[in-house]
Amino acid sequence: VQSLVNILPSEDAFHQEAARISMMSQMIENGQTGNKKGLGFYRNSDDGREVLDLIDLSYGPAPRLNLTLAEKAEQQGVKHLLKDNGVYGQFAWRVLSRSLCYAASLIPEVGDSPVGIDDAMKLGYNWIKGPFELLDDIGVDFFINRLEAENRAVPTFLLEARGSSFYRVHHNDHGNELQCRLIGGQWQAIQRDEGIVRFTEKRQTIQPINTCAVASWYDLDNIAVVEFHSKANALDAE
């Protein structure tokens, strides 16, 4: 965090999120710095995994949580989690809405399309989907309407996408192509360097040759690609 604080301009919104947290400072002073030290928000002991008490920074038994909401969100998408009115849904909204708003505010300052930001978060921080891909999953209108209901500022690039999305599949004379939204409402085909094909993008423009509950088979330029979508990529009789 401090490295970003040092390099970002003073007017960058990140500074609002980077204020020093006294609890975190105390954890660092205590040596509770993560896995390398064996101490962080969790600690492994002879009695099993322990969790940090956020009040006095001591450790105690880690209770088994009810994961029904998370399991349904995994099946139905992140929007299911954000629509939950409980503490988990509210926490997810507070964290994710700030992150996605910040990403949207960076267009066009750091680039004229969402692709670079999405790639940076996926390749650099191991996100499964980038911020703008998540916004499409959540629903741009749902996201904007909730921000406005909370009297929060809505980034210009996000407002421009109202009633639409940040990515779309467009049909032309050459077939289907994946496009991204640019500032001003224009659309541009996503181009990768020669020899680079991303299946997550290509999959949106083609149909599987065959599919079942556990896997799908695609013909990708005469290359057979099998995508597993079962738990632990397990095969069954199908």
Walk through the language-model features, giving the residues of each:
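N-terminal glycine-rich phosphate-binding loop for ADP-containing cofactors
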Residues: 1-238
